[in-house]
Design a protein with these regions (language model features):
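Bacterial N-terminal signal peptides that target proteins for export
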Residues: 2-14
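Bacterial N-terminal signal peptides
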Residues: 13-23
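Carbohydrate-active catalytic/glycan-binding domains of CAZyme proteins
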Residues: 25-344
Length: 344
């Protein structure tokens, strides 16, 4: 990138950071911390919880779904709901089934009345067969303060990756069905989406990528799940890893080497000591107040987990945190209390 482009990008980031800081200073007293999630297989819809103390999350809408699955043939689940509030609108994406080539999108101004759901197909039919996946999992929606657009990260296994026999997949043996990588699609209006492109590939099966801008260091922070079996000698997984980009250009992130695992197997943060039950997935990261907040799922152990950190290095694991029963893989997000219809 030329120096003039770098200077323009820096100026845009400074302006975005100033706007973000002003917004937090004004809105923080009236903001609510919310958590969207699903239960069981996702057939019942999207649920919503809130917290006043950051330790106990209570279900809203009398513990009933705030959004029910659209009746799409073969794509009628609402797993991994990711919600983002921006400029008065809640944007939501979700996994619509275990197999397929779409994810779902809908929007709302109050988390009660939703737009007509639409199917987003990030891989066009024009792509070669070996680049057409049969799964689109865990879409995570983000707003880019520099580009002033939105991007969705998600995981897919293409036949090309599955058949390369490099043993980078979940069980480390050639031919395993899933060898996910993280892809990206971008949009400005949620009507047209860019063609999916490979976004993060460090040579191992990965999923559940979530990113947040760090105003202090002027870069992006990513937390991602390594899907590989915890018993493998090379890159043992079922855990969460953290990395940072070199700057704020989300199209050219240039991520640094991964840290040691921060949650799940082979990490300092887990609840159940059994390797199979301490696996971590579905992270959600939020900056609120003076802390970073991290929620993740221990699906085999049956509990969501919560940790906080002032610097993304020293973590406090709040093992006593409470979430609604059977809550799974969701998203922490902030919104003005006046924008949320549900009071209980």
């Amino acid at each position: 990138m030329e120096s003039g482009s770098r200077g323009a990008l820096t100026r845009r980031w400074i302006i975005a950071a100033q706007i973000l800081g002003a917004h937090l200073a004004i809105a923080a007293p009236t903001e609510r911390m919310l958590f969207s999630y699903f239960r069981d297989n996702g057939k019942d819809g999207v649920f919503l919880a809130t917290t006043e103390d950051g330790r106990e999350f209570k279900a809203l809408n009398d513990d009933k779904p705030i959004f029910t699955p659209p009746k799409w043939r073969g794509q009628n689940l609402t797993r991994d709901p990711s919600i983002l509030y921006h400029d008065g609108i809640f944007h939501m994406v979700w996994t619509s089934n275990w197999t397929g080539r779409i994810f779902g999108y809908a929007s709302s101004r109050n988390l009660a009345d939703w737009s007509e759901p639409v199917q987003v197909r990030p891989f066009p039919d024009s792509l070669p067969k070996e680049d057409q996946p049969d799964n689109v999992w865990a879409p995570e929606i983000h707003h880019d303060p520099v580009k002033n657009d939105f991007f969705i990260l998600f995981a897919s296994t293409t036949p090309r990756e599955r058949n390369d026999d490099d043993a980078s997949n979940n069980n480390g043996k050639p031919g395993f069905r899933y060898d996910n990588r993280v892809f990206i699609t971008r949009t400005k209006d949620f009507k047209t989406f860019s063609e999916a492109r490979l976004y993060f590939d460090r040579g191992f099966a990965s999923i559940d990528a979530v990113m947040k801008p760090d105003p202090a260091r002027k870069n992006w922070v990513m937390i991602i799940k390594c899907s590989r079996d915890e018993s493998l000698k090379t890159m043992p997984g079922r855990n969460l890893w953290l990395t940072r980009s070199s700057g704020m250009d989300s199209d050219k992130p240039d991520f640094a080497p991964l840290t040691a695992p921060i949650a799940g197997n082979h990490s300092p943060m887990f609840e159940d000591p059994s390797p199979r039950k301490s696996m971590a997935e579905g992270p959600s990261l939020l900056r609120h107040g003076e802390l970073w907040w991290l929620v993740w799922d221990e699906p085999a152990g049956g509990h969501l987990q919560l940790a906080t950190s002032p610097d993304l290095k020293a973590w406090t694991h709040h093992k006593g945190a409470k979430f609604p029963p059977r809550a799974q893989h969701g998203t922490l997000f902030l919104a003005p209390g006046s924008a949320v219809s549900w009071s209980r």
